[in-house]
Each structure stands twice: as C-alpha cells, then as structure tokens.
Amino acid sequence: MGIRAIVVDTAGTTTDLNFIQDTLFPYSSKALADFLEENQTNVLVDNCISDVKDIALEPDASLERVVEILQQWIAEDRKATPLKTLQGLIWKQGYAQGEFKGHIYPDFIDSVKEIKAQNVRLYSFSSGSVDAQKLLFSHSDGGDLTEYFDGHFDTRTGNKLFKQAYLNIINTISLAPKQVLFISDVLEELKAAEQAGMRVMQMVRETTQRTGDYPQITNFKELSF
C-alpha cells in the first residue's frame, strides 16, 4: 500500500529548533504582558485567559498573575492550548511587522513541490497552534508555502506523545493508517504514531540526537516515493 499522505512535525524536522527557542519564544515572552493588556476584551484572548485560570486552578487570578503563569509555561515549554493560541496571536503581530521570517530548512522547501507532484497530501502536526503553523509556512524565508499543504493539526487533535492523536488524524484525513507517513525527530512521537498504525520515519538533523530503530533520513531530499 503506497504512501498517500505525509504528516510532518515542525520543530526539528521542517524548522530549526533554535528558531523556535531563540526567536519565537523570547518574542512572545517579551510581548506577552502588553499584548494581554491591550487585547483582554477580545473574545478569543479573553477565553484563553479564562482557560489559563482553569488549568492553573486559580479562578480569581489577576491579569498580572495570568502573565506570570504564562511566562512560567513558556520557560517550561508547556504544551498548553491557551498558551499556544496566545503565542500564535503574538507571533502574527511579529510576522506582520517584519520582526522575523519563519525558518524552514531549504531541503523541505525544495521537496514540497515533488511531494505534491506525486499526488501525495501534505499535513503538519505541531504543539504550536494551527494559526502559528500557517504563519510559519506563509511567512517563511522560502516564501509562502501554504499552497502545498492540505491541512494542519495541533494540540486540539491530541497530545503528540499519545496514540489517540494519530488515530484522530487518520480519521480526519480518511486514509488507511499504512497510507500515512509521519516524519519527526522525536522518538516518543514516532512510537505513538506507529502504535496508531502509521508508517514512521525519524528526521536526524543533529549528530547528538537520540535515535531509535526507525527508518531515518537526514533531510527531505532523501525521501523516495
């Protein structure tokens, strides 16, 4: 059964992890307090603030306290949905103002056309919000790549470390599990996807990276169809 869809992880796979850690995270951390102060009456932002209070079990938390909680979550790289939603909104500002461009590895930029030419669908799955993924790929240093994607998935689909998230993706895209290839640098994610029946492949871009018994590539040009 041939591959009909590829699902890619972002950080460490399509995108340099350093861009996330050294550019995006610090930008959202620095802008967070002002952004919440200026946008707290926005329905989406207000809902995120409420969700933060719920998750932290602090229903009466002040806005200042919410900022403290979110800053701690950023430092911990916590995959909380309200944090990821707010980060996406803040990054949207940064992209629009030209503060940075999304880093995408050149080999992925070169490969997306070939993937589409082979009639293979392309999706991304990240702990970052769908909106943040769209921003990354639409404002990339290789131009707007969104036309090559058939969809994006985030924490609303499920935790990347658990099988159910990948079962949800399979159900959404309506393909047999073995028709879907998941590519990530993280062993635990590959294990979860494999448990869901997907084919998996580890992206190994760093020599210091933990590796397992999965098929490996060092860049997307090594993919064969």
Curated annotation (Swiss-Prot):
Subunit structure comment from the entry: Monomer.
The protein's name: Enolase-phosphatase E1
Family: Belongs to the HAD-like hydrolase superfamily. MasA/MtnC family.
Signal peptide: none
Entry note: cofactor: Binds 1 Mg(2+) ion per subunit.
Any GO molecular function: magnesium ion binding
Catalysed reaction equations from the record: 5-methylsulfanyl-2,3-dioxopentyl phosphate + H2O = 1,2-dihydroxy-5-(methylsulfanyl)pent-1-en-3-one + phosphate
Pathway membership, UniProt: Amino-acid biosynthesis; L-methionine biosynthesis via salvage pathway; L-methionine from S-methyl-5-thio-alpha-D-ribose 1-phosphate: step 3/6; Amino-acid biosynthesis; L-methionine biosynthesis via salvage pathway; L-methionine from S-methyl-5-thio-alpha-D-ribose 1-phosphate: step 4/6
Record keywords, A-Z: Amino-acid biosynthesis, Hydrolase, Magnesium, Metal-binding, Methionine biosynthesis
EC annotation from Swiss-Prot or TrEMBL: 3.1.3.77
Cofactor: Mg(2+)
Function: Bifunctional enzyme that catalyzes the enolization of 2,3-diketo-5-methylthiopentyl-1-phosphate (DK-MTP-1-P) into the intermediate 2-hydroxy-3-keto-5-methylthiopentenyl-1-phosphate (HK-MTPenyl-1-P), which is then dephosphorylated to form the acireductone 1,2-dihydroxy-3-keto-5-methylthiopentene (DHK-MTPene).
Gene Ontology terms describing biological process: L-methionine salvage from methylthioadenosine
